[in-house]
Amino acid sequence: MDKRHDPSRRIIAPHGTQLSCKSWLTEAPMRMLMNNLHPDVAERPEDLVVYGGIGRAARDWDCYDKIIEVLQRLEDDETLLVQSGKPVGVFRTHADAPRVLIANSNLVPHWANWEHFNELDKLGLAMYGQMTAGSWIYIGTQGIVQGTYETFVSVAKQHFEGISKGKWILTGGLGGMGGAQTLAGTMAGFSVLACEVDETRIDFRLRTRYVDKKATSLDEALAMIEAANQAGKPVSVGLLANAADVFAELVKRGVTPDVVTDQTSAHDPLNGYLPQGWTMAEAAAMRKTDEAGVVKAAKASMAVQVQAMLDLQTAGAATLDYGNNIRQMAFEMGVENAFDFPGFVPAYIRPLFCEGIGPFRWVALSGDPEDIYKTDAKVKELIPDNPHLHNWLDMARERIAFQGLPARICWVGLKDRARLALAFNEMVKNGELSAPVVIGRDHLDSGSVASPNRETESMLDGSDAVSDWPLLNALLNTASGATWVSLHHGGGVGMGFSQHSGVVIVCDGTDAAAKRVGRVLWNDPATGVMRHADAGYEIAKNCAKEQGLDLPMQE
């Protein structure tokens, strides 16, 4: 019997102001853990899987129940330690210390590979936390929509003189992360054809308005794209098909998309990528009897897909890796030039990171959408001269369906994160918001990740693989008074390829919270500016100087 599987479980976080815990500082992590497993949020909540292949919120259901039990009795001078989804200890700390400290799927480097991790996973000794799954701050697909939108806007600027009308994107994957591509693409003015092997995922994206149409054949999908482009109105199409098959077929036909990328769960060849010619049922059965065979077949299909991406790039498509490590998998299967197309961070996002700009997100613990709409208005009020940001907030309100507790994401930088957070705390204090909010972010951020095939690819000074930076980020956020802090390995790109840290803080309207918020939401993005300044980026050096950061070696 698998202790991680329980189809009878249906987890819904409490709404309103009645507490199940002793304070909002412990109520918040409890609600956010539960929200990660909301049926409209998680990919497979009955298995504790939130997104990204096998990214879980807790190690098994016994651990989940015990975490909830401990949070409900935890005092405001105690800290719960969670080791790979298992609550292992409660210790006396102090009121400004984190209430929860989390470490997920961290392995000594020599053993940091999927083979060793999978053995530990089978023994119940480890849990893959992805990024925001095991750190309890996943907000559904919205969590990556704006970052994807910003990327596609940058693609249009760099390759098409800012004009996306009449152009289309080819991609793969409509899971928790990949599902953002279709909505982000149409928001940026592109049509999008997204291949997905799991029909339930396409149907879910249709239901939540992330996908406009479903197709069951390539001809049907291409006709939908062509009609939309002729009409000058972007459309997103979820095509029930294997991405490797479709990408290769387009090369064969001589059909070249304007943009090519991919967000299948290629980072996990055992659990995340369906080999060509296989059904999902066949893959599920084979995972139980021949793991090595599944991995080999999946990576062979990835090689086919990446070769097709390279061929489409040669034919004129703007081609980019969207951070799932598919190039590495193809390279290991003999595609020697797999890295000839760039990752999205060095190509389009790094200038933002240099100014500490990244995925700032917040969640209304009340469950009331009005609290989010009021904070949207506050963001516009405090940042009046950023029409691009205002446009994003307007589009988000109009087009993004809330999943679970209402939430919002918007990319803001060092100079604005603390300012916004303090304003939100004041709104809680004066009753404008009906309950506290939590503020967090993706681990994909300016100073919180080392990932040589994604966030830290092609660093100016060659420091791609140096992982001191996310460790320092986690330590500083702990010292600064975050409500919970996490340190993970393997998120996004898989075992052995990344280390990263997460942070969440509660705005409960108290003066003590204001002090913590001011420290955390300044220091957290400041570490990103520091990291990029240290690597030699002039934008980061200038930002550090303008914002008065004390960086001894930059004097």
From Swiss-Prot:
Its cofactor is NAD(+). Its EC number is 4.2.1.49. It is found in: Cytoplasm. NAD(+) binds at residues 52-53, 130, 176-178, 196, 201, 242-243, 263-267, 273-274, 322, 492. It catalyses: 4-imidazolone-5-propanoate = trans-urocanate + H2O. Pathway: Amino-acid degradation; L-histidine degradation into L-glutamate; N-formimidoyl-L-glutamate from L-histidine: step 2/3. One of its GO terms (biological process) is L-histidine catabolic process to glutamate and formamide. Keywords: Cytoplasm, Histidine metabolism, Lyase, NAD. One of its GO terms (cellular component) is cytoplasm. The active site is at C410. Belongs to the urocanase family. Catalyzes the conversion of urocanate to 4-imidazolone-5-propionate. This is Urocanate hydratase.
